[in-house]
């Protein structure tokens, strides 16, 4: 999700306040007053289309419930839901990152997820308010050109990237919201003032190598146009698959355990309070963290980590159980507003 799209969420939240004074809908996985045996669920999805389509197909086959998917950037969809308020046609909202869901939850637009569904994933990867569930995860990593840098030369901390030694060698894609959790983590650990100075430093070091998206960033690192950048893990794996192993001149590596640059990003889903198909929406949420959908995530080329039902990580990824990220929580990541404000102040948005 682009930073401009998340800003739309925050702007839309002002207008949404007047639209969310609606009665709560009590739902269970067994049914509800807003259900139909022939219902067609409307899914607003900001997740990878390939993964979502595979999961939807499996859900339809298993349940007989049809799903109509509207695919777009999660920021665009979140802003639209806020504008639509209680009249939104969406039944379920699925995202790549937690801040978009937190924004909707903060305005009372999501209903509670069934306890039995939430129990399928660790509580730390789902909404503190229990109104959305964690479905999959990614981890922020270093990507570096292996012809120009040895692994032993890599920074141990994301803070080191502001040092003069990386001037002209660093790549950034600051408008990608995958970068914002790192900014939030830096601010949470070191304070906003130091986070601002760090952003000024990396902006200076990345001058001439600031890209519009992570795909461009990882491509430029791989081609040797720039030495190092910070991305979510799956961008490197997808580049490897795209260009073929013989043309890979880069690698991914983690920051030191617990570093603010070593962050878990959670992709999740929630059901809308305004859904006219409450029971079916809850069934879909349960399916997302059940074994069938989680195995699809584990084997899919999106290279994400499954979070539910004890499904193991895909073979190419560092095992999820061995990751040692910054302890920042989804609650602390919030709506992403802290990161957005800092990035704006640093002229990176």
Feature-to-residue mapping (PLM):
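Extracytoplasmic/periplasmic substrate-binding proteins
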Residues: 211-274, 309-316
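Extracytoplasmic ligand-binding site segments that recognize negatively charged/polar headgroups
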Residues: 46-53, 72, 76, 88-226, ...
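An extracytoplasmic/periplasmic, membrane-proximal ligand-sensing/linker region
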Residues: 193-194, 306-349
């Amino acid at each position: 999700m682009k930073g401009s799209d998340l800003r739309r969420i925050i702007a839309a939240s002002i207008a949404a306040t007047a639209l969310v004074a609606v009665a709560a809908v009590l739902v269970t996985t067994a049914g509800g007053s807003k259900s139909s045996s022939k219902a067609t669920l409307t899914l607003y999805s900001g997740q990878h289309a390939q993964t979502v389509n595979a999961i939807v197909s499996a859900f339809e086959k298993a349940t007989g419930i049809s799903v109509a998917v509207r695919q777009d950037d999660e920021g665009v969809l979140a802003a639209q839901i806020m504008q639509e308020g209680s009249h939104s046609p969406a039944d379920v909202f699925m995202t790549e990152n937690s801040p978009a869901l937190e924004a909707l939850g903060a305005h009372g637009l999501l209903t509670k997820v069934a306890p039995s569904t939430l129990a399928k994933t660790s509580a730390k990867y789902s909404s503190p308010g229990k109104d959305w569930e964690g479905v999959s995860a990614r981890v922020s990593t270093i990507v570096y050109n292996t012809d120009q840098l040895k692994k032993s030369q890599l920074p141990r901390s994301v803070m080191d990237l502001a040092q003069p030694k990386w001037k002209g060698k660093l790549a950034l894609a600051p408008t990608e919201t995958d970068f914002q959790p790192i900014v939030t983590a830096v601010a949470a650990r070191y304070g906003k003032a130091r986070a601002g100075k760090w952003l000024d430093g990396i902006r200076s070091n990345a001058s001439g190598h600031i890209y519009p998206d992570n795909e461009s960033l990882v491509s430029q690192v791989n081609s040797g146009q720039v030495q190092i950048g910070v991305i979510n893990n799956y961008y490197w794996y997808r580049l490897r698959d795209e260009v073929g192993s013989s043309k890979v001149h880069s690698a991914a590596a983690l920051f030191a355990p617990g570093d603010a640059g070593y962050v878990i990003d959670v992709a999740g889903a929630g059901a809308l309070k305004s859904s006219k198909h409450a029971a079916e929406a809850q069934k879909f949420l349960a399916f997302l963290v059940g074994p069938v959908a989680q195995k699809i995530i584990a084997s899919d080329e999106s290279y994400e980590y499954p979070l539910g039902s004890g499904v193991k990580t895909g073979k190419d990824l560092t095992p999820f159980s061995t990751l040692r990220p910054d302890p920042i929580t989804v609650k602390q990541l919030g709506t992403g507003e802290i990161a957005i404000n800092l990035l704006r102040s640093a002229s990176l948005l």
